[in-house]
Amino acid sequence: MSFTFQTEVRADLGKGASRRLRRAEQVPAILYGAGQEAVSLVLDHNKVITAQQEAAFYSEVLTLVVDGKEVKVKVAAVQRHPVKPKVVHLDFIRA
């Protein structure tokens, strides 16, 4: 199974900006690795929740579309809300 996510590069950073994204049903994320600069991203929360129910989401190489370019990544970390069924933040590492 392959996973592809459309992403947007985040312009606003910080706690307040992240909270606004979460209220808008989006997930803040970070993409790093391969000797390149880290990039802050935004993903759709509902698509992430649906995909993370599959075990392959955590073990396979995923595709992120960042500024029209496909980037192969693996999930490095997932932060979840302690009570609600929500993903709070994702870390991706370039594959």
Swiss-Prot record:
InterPro entries: Rbsml_bL25/Gln-tRNA_synth_N, Ribosomal_bL25/Gln-tRNA_synth, Ribosomal_bL25_long, Ribosomal_bL25_short, Ribosomal_L25_dom, Ribosomal_uL5_bac-type. GO terms for biological process: translation. GO terms for molecular function: 5S rRNA binding; structural constituent of ribosome. Signal peptide: none annotated. CDD domains: Ribosomal_L25_TL5_CTC. Keywords: Ribonucleoprotein, Ribosomal protein, RNA-binding, rRNA-binding. One of its GO terms (cellular component) is cytosolic large ribosomal subunit. Pfam families: Ribosomal_L25p (PF01386). Disulfide bonds: none annotated. This is one of the proteins that binds to the 5S RNA in the ribosome where it forms part of the central protuberance. Part of the 50S ribosomal subunit; part of the 5S rRNA/L5/L18/L25 subcomplex. Contacts the 5S rRNA. Binds to the 5S rRNA independently of L5 and L18. PANTHER family: RIBOSOMAL PROTEIN L25/GLN-TRNA SYNTHETASE, ANTI-CODON-BINDING DOMAIN-CONTAINING PROTEIN, RIBOSOMAL PROTEIN L25_GLN-TRNA SYNTHETASE, ANTI-CODON-BINDING DOMAIN-CONTAINING PROTEIN. Belongs to the bacterial ribosomal protein bL25 family. This is Large ribosomal subunit protein bL25.
